[in-house]
């Protein structure tokens, strides 16, 4: 069955003041709690503009991500400074698994028909293996496709989240990951607007493209 992607914020550091307080700690004789929206914004912005963005590591968020492909998981896991807990294909029976259909396949009726047939055939074989032949899930999972969906609990600090957003909201990013990144970024900007001020694709921040093959929205860096 075709899956629907969902991103949900499970928890986050309650106050943006933590980053401003950390910044103030570095240049003061004692630790003072920075409060007041304008003071927090001024301190945080000054630190980031000065290249002192390690203060962002004191703020973190945890997301639940569902209805995404194992192909997405492979890309997400390349970001090393994150914490992941993933639905196990070894212990969870995947009979009747959901799957992701990329937009290009969705828009080609003939290819989509064959694609869906393949997913159903794979699902049928998986069920035969696990139910009729008592082959364990840990071995039956070898036939599961990259399109098979998974559930993820994902935690990262604000510095790493902004780094992910700078790369994965780019038009060159595969659409599935771009959709997830944009949804996470939207949520982060709602709960921590000061910290995530200016978050987004690198080109939106710098005004030029650093990709070897850009989308054409911004000129290449000379």
Give the role of each language-model region.
Residues 1-222:
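Family-specific signature for flavin-dependent thymidylate synthase
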């Amino acid at each position: 069955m075709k899956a629907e992607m969902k991103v949900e914020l499970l928890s986050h550091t309650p106050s943006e003041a933590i980053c401003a307080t950390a910044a103030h700690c570095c240049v003061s004789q004692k630790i003072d709690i920075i409060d007041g929206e304008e003071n927090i914004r001024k301190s945080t912005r000054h630190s980031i503009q000065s290249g002192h963005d390690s203060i962002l590591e004191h703020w973190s968020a945890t997301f639940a991500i569902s209805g995404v492909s194992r192909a997405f998981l492979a890309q997400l896991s390349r970001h090393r400074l994150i914490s992941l807990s993933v639905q196990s294909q070894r212990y969870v029976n995947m009979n009747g698994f959901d799957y992701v259909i990329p937009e290009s396949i969705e828009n080609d009726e003939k290819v989509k028909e064959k694609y869906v047939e393949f997913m159903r055939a794979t699902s049928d074989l998986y069920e035969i293996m696990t139910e009729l032949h008592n082959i364990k899930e840990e071995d039956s999972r070898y036939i599961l496709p990259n399109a098979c969906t998974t559930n993820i609990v994902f935690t990262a600090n604000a510095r790493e989240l902004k780094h992910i957003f700078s790369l994965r909201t780019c038009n060159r990013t595969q659409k599935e990951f771009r959709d997830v990144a944009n949804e996470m970024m939207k949520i982060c900007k709602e709960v921590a607007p000061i910290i995530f001020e200016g978050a987004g694709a690198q080109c939106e921040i710098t005004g030029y493209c650093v990709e070897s093959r850009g989308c054409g929205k911004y000129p290449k860096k000379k």
